[in-house]
Amino acid sequence: MDIKRSNQGAGQLVGETAESGQQRYPGRFSRRDFEAIAERAVLREPGQEPGREGAARAEALGMALDAGVRVDGRRLWDSLMELAKIGATPKGGVCRLALTDLDKAARDLIIDWGQQAGCSITIDQMGNVFMRRGGRNDALAPVLTGSHTDSQPTGGRFDGIYGVLGGLEVIRTLNDHGIETERPIEVVIWTNEEGCRFAPGMTASGVFAGVFALDYALGLHDMDGKTLGEELRRIGYAGETPCRRRPIHAAFELHIEQGPILEAEGLTIGVVTDAQGQRWYEIEMIGQEAHAGPTPMPRRRDALLGASRIVQLVNEIGLRHAPLACATVGMMRVYPNSRNVIPGRVFFTVDFRHPQDEILARMNDELREGIARVTAEIGLEAKIDQIFYYAPVAFDRACAQAVRSAASRLGYGHREIVSGAGHDACYLAQVAPTSMVFVPCVDGMSHNEIEDALPEWIEAGANVLLHAVVDRASEPG
């Protein structure tokens, strides 16, 4: 599905007067300023080889950026706050579950903004939205950035959406300054990153990377039995473009850290070098429903008792492999859920994370051994389904260096960091050179309505993204 809207003045640089092409922006450079910088950079010495011109253009862009090109922090913040109204919750967060009407409204608004910025829009079979700004050579593989619009049921204003709007701000800023990159730049909205409505998460980026089959992903269903494919069609985001890997020159995802390290150390930028591996499980403990009064304690086959012991075991496993391990039981459903009936069945989830795959495997073994022991002691049955796994990710070193160099040039305090959360970038890294940019969030809080970030952090991360994206988008073929 391709969406194209004709805009008045198409082809004219944003902010440029038709008469002169020289309009200045407050505190910014005019187009003529940049042309002068570029002219100095591309002047050839006698006998200079022809292939040097593309490299010289890249150098010119670097000089221009170093000379003072920065994102409009106020515009980015205002865009974030406008999106936060869609699905706003009483405590200041958002509830914008994947492929609901609220998710559609967020996508619609961002697409409108993308078209106003001169982007062409493509939607693929998984509902992924690609907003493309052309380059000097559109045949070259693009530089990709973006994230997701869906949220947790009690999510925050920055998770995911910051990466999408930060990418859009990069395009707006390049338009403001009349900067043309050698390669196209694309901003993507990935479908169903969170996985709280349709599990597992990171679904559409997984299809793009070849991790999940298209039919499998479209057939995922929510608690009401609605499938992901049905909901894509309902909200008008079932595109026709194939969802599959294609050449990507480099990819960056801008995100809040979702942890406390950067804020605690007084740093502004996290250069993400790696991401933890994850295993998700759905577990069912099956016992025997019985009357809570007449049934003697020794004769009970209490499924909730067994599940409770496994919850404790999960916590012990996490502590055993601390400080790098994380182990969480996040969902539980008890049947028949009556106050005077001994539970006969309990469903719950387990989330294991660790940056070393061998430790993840050990945690898996300890969980299964513990479940076998508990079920034997209480007389229960257990069903264990590992629904999601990806190995720890090592991000591309050249992309990480682009982030590091940008942070250094801009004067932001930074450090290398490992992502504790899963992101679409983790799957994208399997098919394209990829890295991430982190900024702090207040008290390390995320997946919570009180998730917050300071405007100066938000602006800084977008500036680093701008420089990193332009660095890679300036590379010739």
Residue ranges and their predicted role:
Residues 30-33, 37-41, 291, 295-321, ...:
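His/Asp/Glu-rich mid-to-C-terminal helical/loop segments that flank catalytic regions of hydrolases
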Residues 83, 145, 154-193, 279-285, ...:
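Alpha-helical metal-binding/catalytic segments enriched in His/Glu/Asp
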Residues 85, 89, 225-273, 311-316, ...:
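Active-site-adjacent substrate-binding region
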Residues 98-99, 328-337, 349-355, 381-400, ...:
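A short beta-alpha structural unit
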Residues 192-193, 197-358:
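Midchain, well-structured core segments that form catalytic/ion-binding scaffolds
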Residues 60-100, 390, 447:
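N-terminal capping segment at the start of a domain
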Residues 76, 86-89, 146-147, 414-464, ...:
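Zn-dependent metallopeptidase/amidohydrolase metal-coordination segment
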Residues 88-134:
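A non-catalytic alpha/beta surface segment that caps or lines the substrate-entry region
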